[in-house]
């Protein structure tokens, strides 16, 4: 589990100014935190963290010397400026189930010999205790053939009794369909007029 260093943010300084100075703003909230705790982290530290972790990942958040077991709840990415503006964290309590998402990662798609893969779902929503959190669900699609479908209920996360799925178990994660090359028929003289 990765650790991210942060510091309490003074609300006297605007977020825009902090971003210009190389910081990313955020909030830490949770049952044992009154209201929420405004924080700031260096852009460099956030960029490093997001190389391996994202929304739904569990991280250790160190704020002014105090360490929190936290879940990344939201990442506010500014596409126009090509930067992360804000990250929100939820402080975890070992006995409290939290709502999270797990990213779906398709493995071995280059080994599918016939057909085209259609990914219908990018993440799975669920509730679990901190000890049972999952940030990525890997799906091996190498054996898929035309007509094959993998649903949420087919994945390991759905079979874990400690996880309460919020995504429909019947939802299609990925399917393999035939390639249809449509060749336009030549126009006849009558149709051209």
Describe the predicted segments one by one.
Residues 1-193:
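Acidic, negatively charged sequence tracts
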């Amino acid at each position: 589990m990765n650790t991210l260093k942060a510091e309490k943010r003074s609300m006297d300084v605007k977020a825009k100014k902090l971003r210009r100075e190389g910081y990313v703003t955020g909030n830490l909230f949770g049952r044992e935190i009154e209201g929420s705790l405004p924080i700031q982290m260096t852009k460099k530290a956030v960029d490093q963290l997001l190389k391996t972790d994202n929304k739904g990942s569990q991280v250790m958040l160190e704020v002014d010397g105090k360490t929190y077991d936290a879940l990344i709840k939201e990442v506010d990415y500014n596409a126009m400026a090509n930067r992360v503006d804000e990250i929100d964290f939820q402080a975890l309590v070992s006995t409290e189930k939290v709502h999270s998402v797990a990213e779906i990662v398709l493995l071995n798609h280059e080994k599918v010999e016939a057909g085209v893969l259609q990914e219908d779902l990018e993440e799975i929503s669920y509730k679990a205790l901190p000890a049972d959190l999952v940030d990525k669900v890997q799906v091996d699609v190498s054996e898929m053939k035309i007509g094959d479908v993998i649903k949420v209920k087919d994945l390991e996360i759905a079979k874990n009794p400690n996880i309460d799925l919020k995504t429909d178990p019947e939802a299609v994660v990925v399917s393999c369909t035939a390639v249809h090359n449509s060749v336009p028929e030549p126009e006849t003289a009558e149709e051209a007029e």
